């Protein structure tokens, strides 16, 4: 019987506990821990880069299975000691690469313990991928259903449309603002970033821009220079205000100097899907980033839904204030600004097709009872839902027009309003009455003026809903094809398809207020016959064709009344 050192004996199960084998195992574990520590250290320092992947693993059922399972499998195989594999080839990795014709050949050609571990890992990843797909499909449907039910439970129906703020009509479309504003400023090392909607210090709505570094060298070295806001409520004498102050972290700055990097570094478990809201307060520039979080629901199958997680207020000196919804609403710097995420509103209204259940909306077996969907916009609209408008009392609101389910439906079924400060939902249901949608309204605006060379010289653009005396109108702009001006505003009544053309900024305000002050209006046409006409009221039929064009001259005013109003009784001229 051979002598056996106690230090080299095996413990239960044949696992080495001492001697050289035990020391090898200890060295293996220490080495792997060191390698893992280096990986985690580098990952932590660069964590904003991996934010999307890590967040989805924590809050996406499919990615939790695939990404989380793959990470656990990798850790297990990483710490698993080398195991014996019968391999007669004993080829080096370099030789395997040279002789392989495809990645599969490399995978099958690797020998020894590394090759065995890699093949096992690939097998596990393949199984996890299939499982994640099988889980993601029902989890996605459950997410839509739960989100729709939450949205409906928190919403209240209104009997009439809330009144728009007549002092803040959206006169200047985004593309017109972008072109005219960029043509009015000159920066050699900077450019204007993407436009967004904010409130100016005087209460007007404005298109806002970050003044950010331009060019690769400047994005590495220079800082954001401040913010620029331009009034969207008037085309004449439009105000452009620049608030220049260097931002420590900002837009258009790369890596650790960027606002995005520092937002994710300071609050990792939140999504920053919305663009920054650039604005000023007491003459200083700021930027606000709405935040979206997610919450888990375990029944009937684990799934998540997005929620409002407050926002981040970025100061020029680099301070990042992470605010809860309540803190954001009470912050004096953010008074009057929009706080609720636009992207979350888009998700919530987009889920409403599931409000009557998953089966109801399925393409083959679904009854589609009460199913609605976000109204489509034509390609030339240069806008996207939800629309941002200002209501009375300087309350910004996100408006989404919903149409009945179906490819051929273009009329409106419901109109949803979201308070941009509180996230509260209200909606107006049309019941049996069908309102004109944005696509049809743009067609009516074009047909209302057959003398304009549409498409060649002028286009109708950016339909925005506006509520006037309880009625919904579509406020459409007519612009040259180069988007250098707004030649006139066209209002289309969503109920009657009645059309009003106005060229004057102050007249737009008067019309939205429910009255028209015609003294400041300009003639619609330059012809001698129309020199006293300040605007036209266009009456269209059900197809949108103009059947009557009523000129309103200087000294005249218009009032919209119900048919049973005594002022409308016996007016044969108007009726005939």
List where the protein language model places each region:
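Soluble extracytoplasmic regions of secretory-pathway and membrane proteins
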Residues: 3-4, 11-574
């Amino acid at each position: 019987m051979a002598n056996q050192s106690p230090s080299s004996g095996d413990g239960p199960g044949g696992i080495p506990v001492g001697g050289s084998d035990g020391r090898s195992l200890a060295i293996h574990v220490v080495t792997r821990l060191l390698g893992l520590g280096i990986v985690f250290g580098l990952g932590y320092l660069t964590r904003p880069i991996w934010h999307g992947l890590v967040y989805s693993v924590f809050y996406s059922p499919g990615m939790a299975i695939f990404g989380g399972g793959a990470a656990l499998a990798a850790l297990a195989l990483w710490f698993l000691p080398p195991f014996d594999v019968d391999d007669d080839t004993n080829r080096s990795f370099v030789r395997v690469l040279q002789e392989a014709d495809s990645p599969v050949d490399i995978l099958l050609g690797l020998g020894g313990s590394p090759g065995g571990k890699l093949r096992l890992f690939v097998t596990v990843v393949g199984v996890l991928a299939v499982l994640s797909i099988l889980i993601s499909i029902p989890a996605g449907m459950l997410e839509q259903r739960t989100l729709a039910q939450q949205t409906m439970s928190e919403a209240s129906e209104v009997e009439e449309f809330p009144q728009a703020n007549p002092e803040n009509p959206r006169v200047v479309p985004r593309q017109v603002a972008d072109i005219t504003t960029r043509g009015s400023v000159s920066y050699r090392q900077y450019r204007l970033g993407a436009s967004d909607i904010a409130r100016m210090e005087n209460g007007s709505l404005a298109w806002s821009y970050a003044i950010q570094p331009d060019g690769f060298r400047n994005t590495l070295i220079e800082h954001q220079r401040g913010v620029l806001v331009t009034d969207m409520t008037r085309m004449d004498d439009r105000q452009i205000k620049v608030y220049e102050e260097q931002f420590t972290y900002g837009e258009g700055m790369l890596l650790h100097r960027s606002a995005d990097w520092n937002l994710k570094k300071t609050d990792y478990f939140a999504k920053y899907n919305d663009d920054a809201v650039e604005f000023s307060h007491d003459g200083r520039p700021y930027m606000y980033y709405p935040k979206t979080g997610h919450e888990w629901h375990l029944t009937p199958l684990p799934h998540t839904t997005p929620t409002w997680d407050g926002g981040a207020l970025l100061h020029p000196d680099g301070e990042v204030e992470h605010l809860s919804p309540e803190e954001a609403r009470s912050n004096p710097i953010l008074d009057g600004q929009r706080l609720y995420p636009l992207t979350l509103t888009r998700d919530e209204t987009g889920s409403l097709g599931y409000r009557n259940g998953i089966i109801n909306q399925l393409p083959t077996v679904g009854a589609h009872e009460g199913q609605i969907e976000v109204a489509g916009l034509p390609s030339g609209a240069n806008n996207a839902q939800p629309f941002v408008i200002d209501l009375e009392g300087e309350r910004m609101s996100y408006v989404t027009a919903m149409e009945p389910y179906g490819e051929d439906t273009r009329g409106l079924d419901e109109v949803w309003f979201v308070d941009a400060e509180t996230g509260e939902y209200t909606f107006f249901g049309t019941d049996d009455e069908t309102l004109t949608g944005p696509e049809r309204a743009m067609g009516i605006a074009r047909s209302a003026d057959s003398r304009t060379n549409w498409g060649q010289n002028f286009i109708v653009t950016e339909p925005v809903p506006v509520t006037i005396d309880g009625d919904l109108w579509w406020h459409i702009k007519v612009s040259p094809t180069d988007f250098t001006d707004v030649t006139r505003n066209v209002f289309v009544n969503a109920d009657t398809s009645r059309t009003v053309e106005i060229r004057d900024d102050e007249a737009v305000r008067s019309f939205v207020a429910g009255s028209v002050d015609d003294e400041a209006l300009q003639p619609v046409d330059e012809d001698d016959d129309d020199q006293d006409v300040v605007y036209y009221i266009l009456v269209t039929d059900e197809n949108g064709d103009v059947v009557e064009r009523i000129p309103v001259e200087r000294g005249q005013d218009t009032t919209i009344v119900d048919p049973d109003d005594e002022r409308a009784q016996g007016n044969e001229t108007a009726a005939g």
